[in-house]
Amino acid sequence: MSTLDRSIQARARAHLFGLLRAGFRAIPLSDATRDRWRSWFLDRHADWVPEPVRGRANHAISRRPTARSDEAAIGHVAYRTTALPETLPATLVAFYLPQFHPIPENDAWWGKGFTEWRNVSRTLPQFEGHQQPRLPADLGFYDLRTPDVMREQARLAQEYGLGAFCFYFYWFAGKTLLEMPITQWHADTSITLPFCLCWANEKWARRWDGRGHDVLIDQAHSADDDLAFIAHVARYMRNPKYLRVGDRPLLLVYRPHLLPEPVQTAARWRNWCRDNGIGEIHLAYVQGFERPDPRDIGFDAAVEFPPNMSTPPSVTARQRLVNPDFSGDVFDWRELARDMEQRPLRDYTLYPGVNPGWDNEPRRSGKGRIYLHASPRRYRDWLARTVQHRLANAPSAHRMVFINAWNEWAEGAVLEPDARLGYAWLDATRQALTRAPDVATEICSPSACVVLHAWYLDVLDEMLDAIVECGTPLRIIITTDLTKVIEVTKCIQRRGIQAEVEGFENRGRDILPFLHVANRLLDENVQLVLKLHTKKSTHRDDGNAWRGEMLTALLGPQRVDAIVNAFSTDPLVGLAAPEDHLLPVTEFIGGNADALDYLTVRTGSDAPDTNSLFASGSMFWARLEALRPLLDAHLHASEFESEQGQIDGTLAHAIERFVGLAVTHSGHRVTTVEQTLGITKTPSAQPYRYARKAP
């Protein structure tokens, strides 16, 4: 077949697929029937699904890591211990993949020594901001044949609030694969973390999702196989640390409709367990491909399995491609979280699920299905809202949340510490169990903080005078170059000022240090921050006037209390800057168009329009919650250019123009200091003194 013929055939199939999909969606069907028909079609005709839209291959500057792939990002969290409540509000159960040790079958199918780490380590970023490869941190590229690995996993899981692991169990008509870690967990009395099993009852095929005809090992369901299966797993269910619902061992099945007769299978399992000393069991299935009422198939409950059964809007077309041939799908993970946390529970027993991200590019090179913009803080909120709201009326025995997953490294669903963010995902898990994300707290002076970047130390005293003389006690954090920490410390000691001093590499001007500090303050529940820096432009002769105008507007006598109160009384105010220095982004974009485009795509924010404003000079009051689109992007320091005295066109200059966009994307608004104070000013007819409009 010629290339032209194949192209015509592909277009015809895509057109037919669109017609079939439209008709399928128009037919009134139950969720269970619709899911079953969809799975049947895709199992047989996966090649009919049209190619996804492509991203953008041509952009001015390439922005991807060039030196190393294990750099810690803004928001990296170190290991830390925190006491958990004696009684947790829910049992968190994380799915656990045991494919981190070699087995003969994988040696034969994928090459000698294959484990999931081979997929993980080969991965390359497909577009800018694509965080690949994702590499492990403290646990390393572990081998589950080493008992201490699983002991450490159990310890971490318990310290960070998890209640159990759910191991994938692979059974093929009497043959098991990857069972060794489960056997090891079962036998190790030093491990006390509960566990349960999920029978991953698909065939194994060359395709990552089990579809297709190149079958590696198949299932052979029968009545005898049902009995052999339950007899095999019974030894695990007899273990005192096996997870129970009430007093019933919990057994999951991944795809129940692959069982020829699920009702009869469930009955056989129940009868065998009653006859062999197990007693009653609690059967649940995973809503990965289908959503029947569990009672209709002889089961007791269902388990949500995000991101499956949810398709947020595609953001593929926006991506700035590194690989021009990338043909995968990119979705907005935040929309997944928003959708799932608002879903009501069903009239049957349904255990809700959450997900810390998804990216199966390691298994599908150049064709991954990627959920972009996942962040530990947003995952924390999703998990907390699930526990507090979706489970609000659940009986105590059913207060379980399933997390997909603990260690799906090749699918980007991981709680274990990684090189980029450290323990952030585990820390967010623990926070979700110990804090209420939706409780509004009144902003008052102690929750307001000044972050002052001191580069030009000859004006530091002037800046400190303005802070001290504002009349409101404020927490002060001073950032500076590593070489200037001692001098800054001496200055504040000489003046008798209480301030924290933090040193940073001279990169990213005042912006990068501010992002580091703002991220930490947000985690400390500080609500409001005043961003300042020792503004003194070497390329202008009016830098002192610029600095003075902004200090007067932001810190003038009796202003600070009024500004803080304005943020407190109006929760939609996200940023306030001096009116004379709040400018339209599109008119002062300068040489920052490409970097600004990168930031909007990287953060999943809208591109600037004529209403978009920025604080020229980068001094402003801001609600830290309103900066989350920028902070939750977890930029790397290496993305900021080395300091060479640039006056425009760097990532720091672009972020100056982007901050307002982040605020509006978060659902807040940008306003002027004067408006928050009720001051009416006549707009100046003179051109802005301190920057030139774009031509």
Curated annotation (Swiss-Prot):
Family matches, as Pfam families: Glyco_tran_WbsX, RgpF
Stored Gene3D superfamilies: Glycosidases
InterPro entries (UniProt xref): RgpF, WbsX
Domain of life: Bacteria
CDD domains attached to this UniProt entry: Glyco_tran_WbsX
Record-given protein name: Uncharacterized protein WxcX
Source organism of this protein record: Xanthomonas campestris pv. campestris (strain B100)
Gene that this sequence comes from: wxcX
